[in-house]
Amino acid sequence: MGHEQNQGAALLQMLPLLWLLPHSWAVPEAPTPMWPDDLQNHTFLHTVYCQDGSPSVGLSEAYDEDQLFFFDFSQNTRVPRLPEFADWAQEQGDAPAILFDKEFCEWMIQQIGPKLDGKIPVSRGFPIAEVFTLKPLEFGKPNTLVCFVSNLFPPMLTVNWQHHSVPVEGFGPTFVSAVDGLSFQAFSYLNFTPEPSDIFSCIVTHEIDRYTAIAYWVPRNALPSDLLENVLCGVAFGLGVLGIIVGIVLIIYFRKPCSGD
């Protein structure tokens, strides 16, 4: 009897939170609007999350699953994923609302989390990592390696880089963003100048279960920039000479007098 009363008390404490649920949970779904054929639907995700782990709180904003910003709660400011978004990141008019969401999320973890512990299945996603270059590969020219992490849940991870099995320093922060289906993805960037002998590895550790995913990168299908320029010049020169020869042959052919019967 006492156990049932405790469960009932826990449910009563959750009743004031029902107003926070999305309206689609409480009312029938509205009819789908009929948009003109030349219009497209887009999705902007503003996702605040908190957890008993690192990072303890986070905010990501994405447009059609392409991350635009994350929020640095230590500085109370947006951080753009790409430099092109820096001007938009200066807008801080919604900072009080973001801080309220943070405090409310942390309160939910503290007050309601223990009551639901053991009653809700724990979801886990084993992260999948892959590494690629941001620009076409040319030896000797600065480029950026991108470590893309998918199937991430919960978003507790550590990303490290190695070059020939030696730890690399100086890489940028890890950007975590939410995607459809309440899962997450992450990006880590490393600036480098590629060489033919390079071997890089991106090591992703899922903090909640210490699962580690490793993705390797080695140069493939690349030509040194000097050789590439020489090859392109040679091809262009060859095509030019061929065009001249074909032109001369056609001129001679059409100016040749026709033989009579």
UniProtKB/Swiss-Prot annotation:
It is a single-pass type I membrane protein. The gene is HLA-DMA. Residues 121-215 form the Ig-like C1-type domain. Residues 27-124 are annotated as: Alpha-1. Changing residue 181 to A: In allele DMA*01:03. This is HLA class II histocompatibility antigen, DM alpha chain. Changing residue 124 to A: Decreases the interaction with MHCII and peptide exchange. Disulfide bonds join 50-105, 147-202. It is found in: Late endosome membrane; Lysosome membrane. Belongs to the MHC class II family. It comes from Homo sapiens. The chain crosses the membrane at residues 234-254. Changing residue 210 to H: In allele DMA*01:03. Residues 1-26 form the signal peptide. The lineage of its organism: Eukaryota, Metazoa, Chordata, Craniata, Vertebrata. One of its GO terms (cellular component) is cell surface. One of its GO terms (molecular function) is MHC class II protein complex binding. Glycans are attached at residue 41. Residues 255-261 are cytoplasmic. Residues 218-233 are annotated as: Connecting peptide. Changing residue 199 to N: Decreases the interaction with MHCII and peptide exchange.
